[in-house]
Every structure is written in C-alpha cells, then in structure tokens.
Amino acid sequence: MTKLRKLTALLLAGALTLLLLTACSGGGGSSGPEAQAEAKVMRAINNDRANSRAAPLSNDPDMQRIAKKKLDQANLDADLNGSIGRYKFYHDVKYDKETSTLTLIAQYDYHNTKLEDLIGCITENNKASNLNFNHSSNWTKVGVAATIYNGKTYIAITLQVKTT
C-alpha cells in the first residue's frame, strides 16, 4: 500500500512538472503587447466589415510581412509626419495591374482611433485612381504588425484591394 502511495505521488509530481513546463514554454501564440495590439486592430477591422456585411479577414501572413517590413524600415521619430487631428501617421501606396496595397503606420496608444477616418483622409486625394481603400468591404487581404518604440506602441496595417 505504501509503495502504491509513493508511486501515485511520484506520477502526480511528474504530471504537474510536465504541465508546468508545457504551460511556460511559450510554444503557443504570443500574448505580448504587440500581439494584443494586432488582435485589437484585426477585431476593429472585422467589426467594421461586419457592418458592411463583408466576410471577416484574417491577419494574412504575406500582408503582415509587408507591414512588419515597413514598420522596421520606418524612422518612427521622423517618418510619421502626416497628421489627422491629434494623431500622426505615415502611408505608402503601391499600384499594380491587378491589386494594389496601402500601408499605414500610426501610433496606437491614442484612444478611440478610427481606422476608417485615417484611411478616408489619406485616400481623399486618390479618387481618380480607381482604388477604393476607404471602405473595408473592398479589402481583399489585410496584415497588421505592431512594435513598441520608446515606450509607445506603433501599428502598421497593409491593405490590399483589387483594382476595378
């Protein structure tokens, strides 16, 4: 009977140790501040798309890679020189025969940020271009990346639309 108790205790200790090691391994999805910001932006995008009865989009790996690259290459102290109201941003539009992309970088730490307002102001002068970035229901792919720089969170969003 004592051997059975010892064996049970040993098995329980081993199982708890294994559980602790797998829980702390970090092998799953990230939950750091960058990942949380990315998830919030994707939720906001998909909530807006739901209002237009458009299908939800996932954080596309190719678009996210472009967003991350733009975010890494940007001089966040100097490049965010456009401004709408109280927030500063940077944008870059790439035209292609079939699809075109818009990458937007902005500081994420302000509250009540309206992504549609930012995109609407940026694309206001591009009405002649047959591109319609300012309606989320027209987006075919989206990628979101975030970084923390000097204690502030910055996001880069790359949107893709089909040309019409």
Name each model feature, range by range.
Residues 13-16:
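Classic N-terminal secretory signal peptides
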Residues 1-11:
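Bacterial N-terminal signal peptides that target proteins for export
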Residues 25-28:
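Bacterial signal peptide processing site
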Residues 3, 65-68, 72-73, 116-120:
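Polar/charged alpha-helical tracts
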Residues 88-164:
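A well-ordered secondary-structure block
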Residues 19-23:
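C-terminal motif of bacterial Sec signal peptides marking the signal peptidase cleavage site
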Residues 33-95, 140-142:
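Short, well-ordered surface patches within globular domains
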